Amino acid sequence: MNKTTLSLPPHSNGVTLSLNELVHYKNHSLQWLPPSQSVWSKMNGSHQSRQKGRGMDFSEVRQYQPGDDIRSIDWRVTARTGKPHTKLYNEEREQPTMLFIDVSDTMRFGSQLLFKSVQAAHFASLLSWITLAAKDRVGGIIFDGLSTLDCKPSSRQKSVLQFMQSIIEQHNTNSDSEPLDTAQQTSSFAKGLSQLQRLCPKGSEIVIISDFYALTDECKAIFSQLSKHNRLQFVMISDPLEQGSTRFNGTEYVSDNKRSAWLDFSSSSTKKALEQQANLHKAYVQNMAMQLSIQLHCLSSGLPLLSQLTSSQDPSQQDKGAK
């Protein structure tokens, strides 16, 4: 891949979202299909490839697409509509992808390139197109800090586009809203995970995309239940400034929704304190993930998504150069 390919989508401004911006990742989906390579292997995880034959349980009928098995053509629907339609089947090895996308207050922050919430949407979009290319279903829940929006899993491109439009609307509509109370947000986060549990088909691959600042011990029991019948992945998104990595040397008034203060970024002790706080938070998330045998992956909002997936270096380490 050349440098241009690894840059941001041409329609991205880093703060708000557009449909063209998310559809951009469709062009990159095929290269990440297992078994040749996978997003998870590039993020120091493992993603088992699935070899799928013709399914056994009928799922739905949709218009024929290139690559569909001609033996599955539904001739009755084809004759009635005048357009070829094919039957889709659920297979024993089918693995729907269910995404939990956090676009809450703490995610709407970025010091260099993107808001964390925008990076979350980019990654969710890439996973959605990869899942669609693998002829699996994708859906999920969009969490804005107070409420959730459900999108049932589907293997139709139209449904995936509607899913992305929902992410955009949920993200952009709440961009200027007042910050929520921390206790309220953590409670809503747990409720959103419970909703995911009700929506999720058994045997799904569940991907939680968040900065996990709303994570509490209450969530552990929910994750434990989800992991009994599904495969979970944590994708933790952070910003370089949260880790003390910044070229800014002035004084800035900042808030984390719990407290506000003036910070002197020319001071090495300020940057060190931020780094220590970030490390403590990451350790908390890592510990919960380890206890539940959930894989934890990291992404930075300070770098384009595709450049991180093609690098062997941890995103948090790539950001260190910004100090």
Question: What do these predicted regions represent?
Answer:
Residues N2-H47, Q63-D68, V77, T86-L99, ...:
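Exposed, interaction-prone extracellular/peripheral surfaces
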Residues K52-G55:
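A positional/architectural concept
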Residues S125-S128:
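Structured adenosyl-cofactor binding patch, chiefly the S-adenosyl-L-methionine
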